[in-house]
Amino acid sequence: QMCDKLGIMSQNNRVDIGVRFECHAEIWAPITDMIYEAKIIYRSPKTRCLCRTFCMNPNGSVVAENTNGIITVNGHSYKDPKFHTQNTNFALLVTHRFTEPFKDSNAYGEYIANLTNMLSGGVMVQRFGDLIDNRRTNRKRLNESFVHPTLSAAEPGNLALALPKQTLDTIIEMIYALDKA
């Protein structure tokens, strides 16, 4: 509104939607030991969307955050070794750019976050294998998992019920690409 008032052209019709990915720290140690926060960008040949890593936390924890009643996640990493975990976490964000007539990309992102909250009662967690098998993660499989999530309050669920297919397909492609790197 301020830009309109001042006659300044502006454009804000993009939103980043994604997940916080958590895995054993030793997997990323060859990178995070050299570069604390690696910035990796992937363009999906299938969806043509960009996906990027963001806010990498070696030996860190996933935490819940409440923003205007919407529960989302963030990651923290601490210098003090007594707060270190066995996991590294980072966001995988897919950028979506919208065209006319759609104008409210922020509301779209909030809608997806609200939908995830509705399905899980807060933060949702899903094992990658369950995501690929198109099945909801349950507490039993999560407890038997190779990676133990640092946010124990996260509710097992199925991200495919909350995230748009294009977003999820791009994230899955990037995870496979990272695995080959």
Regions found by a protein language model. Give the residues of each.
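Residues forming the flavin
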Residues: 1-181
